[in-house]
A protein has these predicted regions:
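C-terminal substrate/ligand-recognition segments
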Residues: 96, 345-426
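Core alpha/beta catalytic barrel or barrel-like domain that forms the active/cofactor pocket
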Residues: 161-167
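Short edge-strand/loop segments of extracellular domains
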Residues: 167-171, 252
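Conserved, well-structured interaction surfaces
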Residues: 38-47, 51-55, 76-158, 173-186, ...
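An aromatic- and glycine-enriched ligand-binding surface/loop that stacks and positions planar moieties
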Residues: 20-82, 159-161, 185, 192-196, ...
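Bacterial Sec-dependent N-terminal signal peptides
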Residues: 1-28
Length: 426
């Protein structure tokens, strides 16, 4: 036990110390004063804070987080994700290092906020000065959102966590005690309330228009998610009614805003990798690559490696098209298990089933099929992943292509579901 405590303290200290320096590659050689004297360097610092936003594109030793649950199974037993299946993981033996990653992100946010200055006199005579300052006015509020988001990610995993808003030296970091869960939640909600009206609904009218930045909608969505989790019996015990009310009101706040300005809406089309989707509130953007496809194209397709394979549990969770639950005791359901005319259409946007068309060829997951056992690395579940996979990417060595990848952090559908859940448990 003492060894575990010391290991956790050491990890925290490493993350929270050395705030006089900046882990930003493009700024190597610059000290703190240099960093916050020039606009582009300060912008780079905020970009660094953004860079810690999560994206589950095979981050877990090639697998997605779903492979740690009953939603999926990883095709290769060499991945560290197996720790979650065989019970060998622990708070200090994980494969994603959330603690270290997010406290590093929080340290970067604290550094930005503690050293933020409202003006850059060295560029005030530049032609684009006003444009830059109109962008810059939102930076501290974006940093505060990001810090609150990272605290939510920590609190939902560890519950009581150290709440730090200043840069600490090593000896100070060693003496920080965890804050009560409710205090962390109150901090996140308070930050959301304070910055909500400071951020724009959209950046379209901001000079130097940039997408992917924090908006009012993202702040409201974080508040909604935070209060919903806080109301859960896992955290609230039996004292949840007032918390469910707060969660419902937070979700309704965003719903009312959407009804007034139409900023977001539910859509039928695919929303991942679709930056134009009206359902997107906030997403993590990754540059052009084909790494996710190399991991998850089915075995039997050029360059395929199977990767994260959805389970029957996940497939069964998709309803029939008439809204009824899939029932193995209902022969009609069994006969129409993979019938797009009878099954929830979201199933076929998420999972490649036997007989699905992928890259203009039928998927064969049955034993002896071109994508099934006994091929080495064939799906262990009978299914392959379709969601987030960019089918048009080519892994042909003579004609390899890439594409952008977008991981959804908040979508409008979640807010509606948050509201429904909170009302149902109010």
């Amino acid at each position: 036990m003492n060894k575990k405590i010391l290991s956790a303290i050491f990890a925290f200290a490493v993350c929270m110390s050395s705030c006089n320096y900046l882990d930003y590659n493009e700024s190597s050689g610059f000290d703190k004063e240099d960093m916050f004297t020039y606009f582009e360097r300060a912008k780079g610092m905020l970009t660094t804070v953004y860079s810690y936003l999560p994206a589950d594109f095979g981050n877990f030793d090639g697998a997605t987080r779903a492979a740690a649950t009953d939603e999926a199974e990883y095709a290769w037993n060499t991945s560290g994700i197996i720790r979650y299946n065989n019970g060998s993981w622990s708070p200090i033996l994980t494969i994603d290092n959330v603690w270290g990653t997010y406290y590093t992100a929080i340290r970067s946010a604290n550094m930005f906020l503690n050293n933020y200055q409202e003006d850059f006199t060295n560029i005030e005579w530049n032609d684009n000065y006003e444009t830059l300052m109109q962008q810059y006015q939102y930076y501290p509020y974006e940093a505060r959102f990001l810090r609150a988001f990272y605290y939510f990610e920590l609190a939902k995993r560890y519950k009581n966590v150290p709440l730090i808003t200043e840069c600490l030296e090593l000896d100070e970091a060693n003496s920080v005690a965890p804050s009560d869960f409710d205090k962390v939640i109150d901090f996140i909600v308070s930050e959301c309330d304070e910055i909500m009206d400071k951020l724009p609904v959209s950046y379209k009218d901001v000079p130097g228009y940039e997408t992917g930045r924090i908006t009012q909608g993202a702040v409201m969505a974080l508040k909604s998610r935070t209060l919903l989790y806080a109301a859960s019996p896992l955290y609230a015990g039996t004292a949840g009614q007032e918390k469910w009310i707060a969660a419902a009101k937070a979700a309704k706040q965003l719903i009312d805003k959407v009804e007034s300005d139409g900023r977001y809406q539910l859509v039928d089309e695919q929303i991942w990798n679709n930056l134009a989707s009206k359902e997107l509130i906030l997403e993590t953007r990754r540059g052009n690559s084909n790494d996710f496809e190399k991991l998850n194209f089915p075995i039997g397709y050029e360059g395929g490696n199977s990767g994260t394979c959805p389970t029957q549990n996940l497939v069964d969770a998709f309803e029939m098209k008439d809204g009824s639950r899939f029932d193995w005791g209902n022969q009609e359901h069994i006969d129409n298990m993979y019938n797009p005319e009878k099954r929830d259409p979201r199933l076929f946007k998420t999972v490649l089933t036997n007989g699905s068309t992928f890259k203009n060829a039928a998927v064969e997951t049955f034993v002896g099929g071109k994508n099934g056992a006994p091929l080495d690395g064939a799906t262990p579940t009978g299914y392959y992943l379709k969601k987030y996979v960019v089918e048009t990417i080519s892994l042909n060595p003579n004609n390899t292509t890439t594409d952008r990848h977008v991981w959804i952090l908040f979508r409008y559908a979640e807010v509606l579901l948050n509201y429904t859940e909170a009302l149902g448990l109010w």
